[in-house]
Swiss-Prot record:
The lineage of its organism: Archaea, Methanobacteriati, Methanobacteriota, Thermococci, Thermococcales. It is an enzyme of class 6 (ligase). It comes from Thermococcus kodakarensis (strain ATCC BAA-918 / JCM 12380 / KOD1). This is Phenylalanine--tRNA ligase alpha subunit. One of its GO terms (molecular function) is magnesium ion binding. Tetramer of two alpha and two beta subunits. The keyword Ligase applies. Keywords: Aminoacyl-tRNA synthetase, ATP-binding, Cytoplasm, Ligase, Magnesium, Metal-binding, Nucleotide-binding, Protein biosynthesis. Its main location: cytoplasm. The keyword Magnesium applies. PANTHER family: PHENYLALANINE--TRNA LIGASE ALPHA SUBUNIT, PHENYLALANYL-TRNA SYNTHETASE.
């Protein structure tokens, strides 16, 4: 059996003592306490010794308590003055009491029955009583004396004299927990010592001096168990979800996508709905599905020509051949302000601003929707929106991009597409992926932007687009089953969450 030098020395000393406190072994062996503890743990793991621990609540003096142990409690110092003078004002007591001690002293002396209090010439006067003249040592005084003598006293012992809470209230004492460790040799350990242990100091560090002098040939090097468990180290790293978003962004840029810039979380309904060809009487625009700003309530519309084209698309389809929605479009409704409900509003802004054809664009943005918080829903979450614009794009291109997102980026094993409806896309599709804990989880929607939308924004070629809940993508990639964990303060998860890619 391989034993290190500290283990051998500790075991030999323990064999002599049979049972000993760690402090005794430190004294007998001449080793540091850390070395003795490490040796005992090693001996215990090898079945050569047992280590017993016993924790006990104790009371010890605070700084205030130490001061009182030297100069006396405030009431005794005040009583000394009263015994000499018979009576005294608060000013008379300032020579022996601090300002903090002076405030409660009147009530304390009165409660003990050591002084009567009255007013003379507008000043409080304390006059000693017979009980005050005869006052002698109380339980609290004995407790103070005991703590001063022994340093630490078990709570049970102090409680026989005075409640610990009373010492805490007066800031005389405080509680602590001490752990006593006692080592005991086993039969196996005794047998090994009887057989004889060669004490030869080991070297744990190969120094330049050992090499130069050649003494490295003579010394015994300490053996290290490379399989022994060690303390885990948690180096600093990015928040897991933040790191995931950064890698998604980098992957899309590598694929040739251009990131759309965003100035604000607040949109007018014009960009959030109207520019997307979503009618003003659509239920998704009501308070049950979106938030509205109380103040300020309205913003401004973009240039008149763009507004006129959007208005025409809503009322009669504009020059697309569509009949539109067939109602009178209200610019006042379009000016209402709201927190962005979906990232598609940014698609509309970018298309109106101008795009490269062919071109690929994306954005990762925070959006807001009223919802019931649960494992798969948040009221404030991130969404990845994007679109591809080009001459010959079709629905199959869109499905290919969506599947690539789910499989390559989220790591989903199974993906399915279902027909869906959105006012601004036709055809439209919903994408879901299978989560081992949650089952089928909806990722988001996609489709080909309708001409009523794209032509009003100045685009005459097909645009395929999608809006995906990237928080749910992250659930797959990070292996979690509760979306709220993405924003958790749980240190265990933050430390142990796996790194993606």
């Amino acid at each position: 059996m391989e034993l290190s030098y500290p283990e051998k020395l500790t075991l030999i000393k323990l064999a002599e003592l049979k049972r000993a406190k760690v402090e005794e072994l430190v004294k007998e062996s001449g080793l540091e306490q850390v070395a003795v503890m490490r040796a005992l743990l090693g001996l215990q793991a090898k079945g050569l010794a047992k280590l017993h621990e016993r924790s006990e609540r104790v009371v010890k003096l605070t700084e205030t308590g130490m001061k009182y142990a030297q100069i006396g409690l405030p009431e005794w110092r005040a009583l000394k003055v009263l015994r000499e003078k018979g009576k005294a004002t608060l000013d008379d007591l300032k020579d022996v009491l601090s300002e903090d001690e002076l405030k409660p002293i009147v009530g304390l002396l009165r409660r003990e029955g050591w002084a009567n209090v009255r007013k003379e010439d507008g000043k409080l006067v304390l006059e000693i009583t017979e009980k005050g003249r005869e006052a002698s040592e109380r339980p609290i005084d004995k407790a103070l004396k005991l703590l001063a003598e022994r340093g630490e006293v078990p709570v049970k012992e102090i409680e026989k004299l005075v409640p610990v809470n009373e010492l805490k209230r007066r800031k005389i004492g405080e509680e602590d927990v001490i752990t006593e460790r006692v080592a005991e040799i086993t039969e196996k350990g005794e047998e090994l010592v009887k057989k004889g242990l060669e004490l030869k100091k080991e070297v744990s560090v190969l120094t330049p001096e050992l090499i130069k002098s050649g003494k490295w040939r003579e010394v015994e090097f300490r053996k290290f168990d490379i399989k022994a468990p060690v303390r885990r180290i948690y180096p600093g790293k990015k928040q897991p979800y933040r790191a995931f978003l950064d890698k998604i962004r980098r992957r899309l840029i590598e694929m040739g996508f251009i990131e759309m810039t965003v100035d604000s979380l607040i949109e007018t309904q014009f960009w959030n709905f109207d520019a997307l060809f979503q009618p003003q009487n659509h239920p998704a625009r009501e308070w049950t599905d979106t938030y509205q700003l109380k103040y300020p309530k309205v913003g401004s519309l973009p240039d008149e020509e763009l507004v006129a084209r959007v208005k025409a698309a809503h009322e009669h389809g504009g020059d697309t051949g569509s009949r539109g929605w067939g109602y009178v479009w209200s610019p006042e409704r379009a000016m209402l302000l709201m927190p962005r409900a979906h990232g598609t509003a940014l698609d509309a802004r970018q298309l109106a601003k101008g795009v490269e054809i062919p071109g690929k664009y994306f954005t990762i943005q925070r959006v807001f929707r009223p919802d019931v918080l649960d494992r798969t829903h948040l009221i404030e979450f991130n969404q990845i929106d994007g679109f591809v614009v080009g001459e010959d794009l079709n629905f199959r291109h869109l499905l290919g991009i969506l599947k690539r997102f789910a499989v390559e980026i989220a790591g989903a094993k199974k993906v399915k597409f279902l027909p869906d409806y959105y006012p601004f896309t036709e055809p439209s599709v919903q994408m879901s992926a299978y989560h081992p804990e949650l089952g089928w989880v909806e990722f988001g929607g996609a489709g080909i932007f309708r001409e009523e939308m794209t032509k009003a924004l100045g685009i005459d070629v097909p645009v395929i687009a999608w809006g995906i809940g990237i928080d749910r993508l992250a659930m797959f990639k990070l292996g979690i089953d509760d979306i709220r964990y993405l924003f958790s303060y749980d240190l265990r998860w933050l430390r142990e969450a796996r790194l993606v890619w």
